[in-house]
Swiss-Prot record:
GO terms for cellular component: cytoplasm; nucleoplasm; nucleus. This is Metal regulatory transcription factor 1. The keyword Phosphoprotein applies. It comes from Homo sapiens. A motif (Nuclear localization signal) lies at residues 133-138. The modification N-acetylglycine is found at residue 2. The gene is MTF1.
Length: 753
């Protein structure tokens, strides 16, 4: 600034403001030779006069007047002093320092000629008593009635008085803004908010922060120097970078509320001025904050309310929306609600991770091992999940869930093992083709849906029960490839109304999975099958000594369902999309919209053979939902007739006498099953095997491989899931623990029979 001045003096000037420390408030002058005006360093009086070119230079936004932002600051360097605020170089100064041995007077007109019409000057007086060394600064009192505000400079007082007169004459011309300010400088600073300009950068090594005003930079630098404003109240350790913020905080201890609303006798008082401004808008109806989103015309009285509203737009923009666009109600796009996002992964994510999986093929895993792992005591080892998968899903679902619990990272490879189960909701509409998909890893029972439209039936759908996470036996090591078990989209196939899964004779897990989840391509002949039974051998387990086999059948009991999955009919069809083994029609597949299939994965640790590291396996259980007409759910002759027809069919297919009849699905319309052969893997190109026909399957059910296959074969699916039947108490304590809150939930079926 002194570059063009007559005496070539360079001035080191710091603003006189309340937010500066006493050392910062000292005005220091050094000539170009670096000589201090007083040899003793003692200063009796300093006076600074700032010649202003425009009326007022700073809007008083804070309670105590953050002044001095408009002043030109000169900061010291190793080779001298240089000017920071180039916008204020045209302003002139008259300054003098009174010391014991000299009086130093400096007149600096600025880098440009002094203005002819000087509209005002800011006078700062700071005195130091020679005896006590105390510094005293004159305060300027506001003369408006009832206003207690004081300022250290006359210019700041004058700016403050404009607020009483409402002289907000400097208006922002940025599109959609329209804010007005007391001074031109305040407007210039505000425009930097729109332009993102931050010319004042922190020079501390490693700190890359920048600010739009020098005042904010100096406040920030106090964090580096440690010269913060600390609260001295007992038990309070808070500190602040500005004196104004400290004074606001102290009012929380004293209870002082100096800002009172005088609107129509309101009388409410506040500790901060901006709280009063916000309150006044409740009287005036002013809503100055507009939502910038396209098509949204909402306005708000506070910036906080606007930010909260904008988060809603952000969440909608980033929400997981893999649902196809239908011509139906738009509400179906948001009807899929997930309770535990950490259990969910998409088809593409599993395919991306498939290259990292190693180990055996699924065809080498026996059904006995699968069921043994499902019911082994979960206390043997800790349950872990893949945090990377959880994090990616949390980001995709950040609009649908509040939080996802953190879990320890897995230390081994992960894989996905698919077990298909059957869910049969009865509908009053005609049967529709099946679209298999993936769903939570739980064997959900079949709810009974009352008559009505499909939309009504799925408007209040049953929830799905999540199973316990159970470790796999120590004697077995699992490693499955995600890509081998990902179902591909295929044209829909009709499904048997009464399909059930029974634990019994031997069959491979892959064959069972495809038998339930993936019908084969249609052949020339079809045969109506009212019911089909597939058996699985169950490994020996101390927990299952009394219940060696498992039968999953439809049940009228829907009270055990917990609300964790809610979906509309169109979303249901999307969830059930494409799990059959081979494509039926390439043209139909090309025309079908490409969507993601969702897998709910529970990671469980697998104890490998001695000397090997522990691996992780994801148990991903697709649930097939079979739509059928309204079925009778009562224990009457119609249910018995269905059992008799199934029994007579088994007799016609095999000579051995039938075993104890297991509960069958309620009688419904006979659906045509195109073929009785099923692929062992749903992905083309993988190894496949052919399941026996329904006669052979029945024969397998009649010859169980374990002597313990007697009691559980007739277990109802409600008893299997809840294991809290009043008649048959269960020994499977880990699964019972999941249902302890069932009665508290007060869940009742909302579907009429």
């Amino acid at each position: 600034m002194g570059e063009h001045s007559p005496d070539n003096n360079i001035i080191y000037f710091e603003a006189e403001e309340d937010e500066l420390t006493p050392d910062d408030k000292m005005l220091r002058f050094v000539d170009k030779n670096g000589l201090v005006p007083s040899s003793s360093g003692t200063v009796y009086d300093r006076t600074t006069v700032l010649i202003e070119q425009d009326p007022g230079t700073l809007e008083d936004e804070d309670d105590d007047g953050q002044c001095g932002e408009h002043l030109p600051f000169l900061v010291g360097g190793e080779e001298g002093f240089h000017l920071i605020d180039h916008e204020a170089m045209s302003q002139g100064y008259v300054q003098h320092i009174i010391s014991p041995d000299q009086i130093h007077l400096t007149i600096n007109p600025g880098s440009t000629p002094m203005p002819r019409n000087i509209e005002g000057a800011t006078l700062t007086l700071q005195s130091e008593c020679p005896e006590t060394k105390r510094k005293e600064v004159k305060r300027y009192q506001c003369t408006f009635e009832g206003c207690p505000r004081t300022y250290s400079t006359a210019g700041n007082l004058r700016t403050h008085q404009k607020t009483h007169r409402g002289e907000y004459t400097f208006v922002c011309n940025q599109e959609g803004c329209g804010k007005a300010f007391l001074t031109s400088y305040s407007l210039r600073i505000h425009v930097r908010v729109h332009t993102k300009e931050k010319p004042f950068e922190c020079d501390v090594q490693g700190c890359e922060k920048a600010f739009n005003t020098l005042y904010r930079l100096k406040a920030h630098q106090r964090l580096h120097t440690g010269k913060t404003f600390n609260c001295e109240s007992e038990g309070c350790s808070k500190y602040f970078t500005t004196l104004s913020d400290l004074r606001k905080h102290i009012r929380t201890h004293t209870g002082e509320k100096p800002f009172r609303c005088d609107h129509d006798g309101c009388g409410k008082a506040f500790a901060a001025s901006h709280h009063l401004k916000t309150h006044v808008r409740t009287h005036t109806g002013e809503r100055p904050f507009f939502c910038p989103s396209n098509g949204c015309e909402k306005t708000f009285s506070t910036q906080y309310s606007l930010k909260s509203h904008m988060k809603g737009h952000d969440n909608k923009g980033h929400s997981y929306n893999a649902l196809p666009q239908h011509n139906g109600s738009e509400d179906t796009n948001h009807s899929l609600c997930l309770s535990d996002l950490s259990l969910l992964s998409t088809d593409s994510e599993l395919r991306e991770n498939s290259s990292t999986t190693q180990g055996q093929d699924l065809s080498t895993i026996s059904p006995a091992i699968i069921f043994e792992s499902m019911f082994q005591n979960s206390d043997d080892t800790a349950i872990q999940e893949d945090p990377q998968q959880t994090a990616s899903l949390t980001e995709s679902f950040n609009g649908d869930a509040e939080s996802v619990s953190d879990v320890p990272p897995s230390t081994g490879n992960s894989a996905s093992l698919s077990l298909p189960l059957v869910l049969q909701p009865g509908l009053s509409e005609p049967p529709q083709p099946l679209l298999p998909a993936s769903a939570p890893s739980a064997p959900p029972p079949a709810p009974s849906l009352g008559p009505g439209s499909q939309q009504a039936a799925f408007g209040n759908p049953p929830a799905l029960l999540q199973p316990p996470e159970v470790p796999v036996p120590h004697s077995t090591q699992f490693a499955a490839n995600h890509q081998e078990f990902l179902p591909h989209p295929q044209a829909p196939q009709p499904i048997v109304p009464g399909l059930s899964v029974v634990a019994g004779a031997s069959a491979s897990a892959a064959a069972v999975a495809s038998a339930v989840a993936a019908p084969a391509p249609p052949q020339s002949t079809t045969e109506p099958l009212p019911a089909m039974v597939q058996t699985l051998p169950l490994g020996a387990n101390s927990v299952l000594t009394n219940n060696p086999t498992i039968t999953i059948t439809p049940t009228p009991n829907t009270a055990i369902l917990q609300s964790s999955l809610v979906m509309g009919e169109q979303n249901l069809q999307w969830i059930l999309n494409g799990a059959t083994s081979s494509p039926q029609n390439q043209e139909q597949i090309q025309q079908a919209s490409k969507v993601e299939k969702v897998f709910f994965t529970t990671a469980v640790p697998v104890a490998s053979s001695p000397g090997s590291s522990v691996q992780q396996i994801g148990l991903s259980v697709p649930v097939i939902i079979i739509k059928q007409e309204e079925a009778c759910q009562c224990q009457c002759a119609c249910r018995d007739s269905a059992k008799e027809r199934a029994s007579s069919r088994r007799k016609g297919c095999s000579s051995p006498p039938p075993p104890e009849p297991s509960p069958q699905a309620p009688d419904g319309p006979s659906l045509q099953l195109p073929a009785q052969t099923f692929s062992s893997a749903p992905v083309p190109g993988s190894s496949s095997s052919t399941l026996p026909s329904s006669c052979e399957q029945s024969r397998q059910a009649e010859t169980p491989s374990d002597p313990q296959t007697e009691t559980l074969s007739a277990m109802d699916v409600s008893e299997f899931l809840s294991l809290q039947s009043l008649d048959t108490p269960s020994n499977l304590i880990p699964i019972e623990a999941l249902l302890q809150g069932e009665e508290e939930m007060g869940l009742t079926s909302s579907f009429s029979k």
